[in-house]
Amino acid sequence: MANALHNIICLEAEWEYRYDKRNNKFSLNTEPLLNWLRTFHGCDIVYRHILNKQDLQYYLDYFASHKREFKKYDIIYIACHGKHHAISLEGEEGDIDLSELNTMANGFFENRIIHFGSCKTLANLDEVKRFKEDCGAKLVSGYEISVDAMTSAIADAAFFNEIMYYQNIGIFKNEASSKFRKRYESLHKELKFRVY
């Protein structure tokens, strides 16, 4: 087990996977993926389950007020439903757009990689660029369209697997020189996976 250059905080909402025929519609979660990353790469993981906007705000406030403790966690993985330039929490009325999410984070996203494991959150390029600039993120990644849970989990795993040993994460934005972008080109095109 090698030591990764990055560590992850995952904030995951409840998933009601409507396409699932099983009795347990709330059976999806990212914890197995995160455990695999921890075991394979030796990275540290903080996993928090959020049920509603208040939970999300609680954890963002906690992380922001304890920045020194969480300095080494430079990847923020937000796993939930999404809509055009917004995230959506199961059972909550309304969405949280990127601007509101940045306000809720209270500076915690600065100099971090923010990955959205959610449908359509990166659908509006102008909003994504504004979010990245306003929050000071190193990199913002995710999907422009509605994505299948299993296929997007594969893309998320590939992304985290590749990024673990890169200090210069800017290379992921360059389609011409990024081995990651070339290796998974067809998957990225299918899912409209974006890196900014």
Which residues are covered by each model-predicted region?
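Caspase-like cysteine protease fold
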Residues: G94-A105, Y166-Y196
